[in-house]
């Protein structure tokens, strides 16, 4: 879960998958905790909560490059292999099944999916996995039966855009985050040169509230 207690400090870090989660796991003074522990700390210890967010277009691109390109391209199918949940949630819309399709079939289907096709699939399943859900859901999750709301008062919530250098410098100063641990797992995977207007419209619709809440500009072209 993407919640971290900042050691030796009355502070928490909250993020989403594909928003520096891997980097935070490598940070020595960040201790990963579960949602219920974060909720208890917020309620009883009144920490400052540092929340990192990402441009929704870049987050979608990063997930596509990781789950639909990097992982299948590097999968060793000569050994037992299990596809990750943020891949499997797409399978029904792709007509795939781990019971009826071979890993090779699935590998090729993922790799051969264009980014625009990925976005159309995303619209059919984005609520099914935390990697692809709207970022603001982590603060107040509509699908959780328990602990829907983390209960963070506005005055104790600091929001940082990971794509803004000034924001991340402020985040590092506030939390002790070491930039040398920053991971870029998909840096070598080619980024699609252009996002179609149809895909932009779909991303705008899915993540509309993220654009509003975190002051990201929507694109139409």
How should these model regions be labeled?
Residues 156, 179-221:
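Charged phosphate-binding loop/patch that engages nucleotide di/tri-phosphates or the phosphate backbone
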Residues 3-9, 151-154, 196:
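Short, surface-exposed loop and linker segments with low hydrophobicity and enrichment for Pro/Ser/Thr
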Residues 50, 57, 64, 207, ...:
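Aromatic side chains
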Residues 1-56, 62-63, 70:
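PAPS-dependent sulfotransferase catalytic core
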Residues 23, 27, 166-174, 202, ...:
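Amphipathic alpha-helical segments that form well-ordered structural scaffolds
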Residues 30-33, 177, 216:
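Short aromatic/hydrophobic-glycine micro-motifs
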Residues 35-51, 58-191:
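PAPS-dependent sulfotransferase catalytic domain
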Residues 6, 13-17, 21, 160-164, ...:
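Aromatic-acidic/polar surface patches that form glycan- and anion
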């Amino acid at each position: 879960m993407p919640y971290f207690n900042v050691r030796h400090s009355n502070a928490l870090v909250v993020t989403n998958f594909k928003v520096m989660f891997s980097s935070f796991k490598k940070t020595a003074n960040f201790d990963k905790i579960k949602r219920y522990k974060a909720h208890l700390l917020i309620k009883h210890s009144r920490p400052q909560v540092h929340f990192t967010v990402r441009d929704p277009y870049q987050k979608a691109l990063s997930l596509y490059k990781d789950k639909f390109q990097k992982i299948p391209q590097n999968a060793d199918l000569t050994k037992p292999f299990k596809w990750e949940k943020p891949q499997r949630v797409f399978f029904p819309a792709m007509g795939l099944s781990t019971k009826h399709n071979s890993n090779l079939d699935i590998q090729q289907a993922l790799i051969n999916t264009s980014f625009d096709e990925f976005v159309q699939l995303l619209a059919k399943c984005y609520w099914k996995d935390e990697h692809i859900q709207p970022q603001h859901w982590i603060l107040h999750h509509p699908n959780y039966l328990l602990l829907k709301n983390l209960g963070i008062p506005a005055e104790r919530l600091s929001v940082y855009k990971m794509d803004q250098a000034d924001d991340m410098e402020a985040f590092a100063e506030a939390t002790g985050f070491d930039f040398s641990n920053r991971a870029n797992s998909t840096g070598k995977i080619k980024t699609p040169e252009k996002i179609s207007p149809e895909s932009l419209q779909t991303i705008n619709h899915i993540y509309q509230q993220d654009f509003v809440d975190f002051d990201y500009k929507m694109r139409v072209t």
